[in-house]
Swiss-Prot record:
Keywords: Auxin signaling pathway, Nucleus, Repressor, Transcription, Transcription regulation. Belongs to the Aux/IAA family. GO terms for cellular component: nucleus. The keyword Oxidoreductase does not apply. It comes from Oryza sativa subsp. japonica (Rice). Homodimers and heterodimers. This is Putative auxin-responsive protein IAA29. Residues 142-153 have a biased composition (Low complexity).
């Protein structure tokens, strides 16, 4: 008679638990999903499942397990960036480190639409630029570079050589 438990157990490397669940968050969704890393042997398998999940976030875990890596399933053409946080809270792109390192250090995975990732980069760049501009104006004169030129209070009305003193309606 065949032992049921022997065939049901996933093949796991020594030192790792048979299940390694990691929370996956889809951008714009209020909740996360868990996936079992022990069911994946490489980045290709994991990224296929994550991209398929990104296209069908409401899919049940049983439906996701039944997926095979086929191009007609639509996951290959998905336009998602896959990111993850390690145990130290540092964010990486999926595939930046060797698979063995990833499986032992991953804490959370994020599925982000590619255009959203670019918008986030732009927003972070704008915030960095605004912070740099605020710190560059050390003396508060409105000039980021202190080149000896500063706006005086009486120069505020001066627009292209025209001042309020030249206008008779200001009497």
């Amino acid at each position: 008679m065949k032992d049921r438990n022997a065939s049901a157990e996933p093949v796991v490397k020594p030192g790792l638990s048979p299940s390694r669940f990691v929370k996956v968050f889809m951008h714009g969704e209020p909740f996360g999903r868990k996936i079992n890393l022990a069911l994946h042997n490489n980045y290709d398998s994991l990224s296929f499942t994550l991209k398929k999940l990104g296209n069908n976030y409401s899919m049940s875990p049983f439906e996701l397990e039944g997926l095979v890596n086929k191009e007609e399933d639509g996951a290959i053409d998905s336009d998602f960036d896959l990111l993850y946080d390690d145990m130290d809270g540092v964010r990486y792109f999926l595939g930046d480190v060797p698979w063995e390192v990833f499986t032992t250090t991953v804490k959370k995975i994020y599925i982000v639409p590619a255009e959203q990732q670019n918008e986030n980069d732009y927003q972070e760049e704008e915030e960095d630029n605004a912070a740099a501009a605020a710190t560059a104006d050390e003396d508060g004169d409105g000039a980021a570079a202190d080149d000896g030129v500063a706006a005086a209070a009486d120069d505020v009305d001066d627009v292209a050589g025209y001042t309020s003193n030249d206008d008779p309606s200001f009497d």
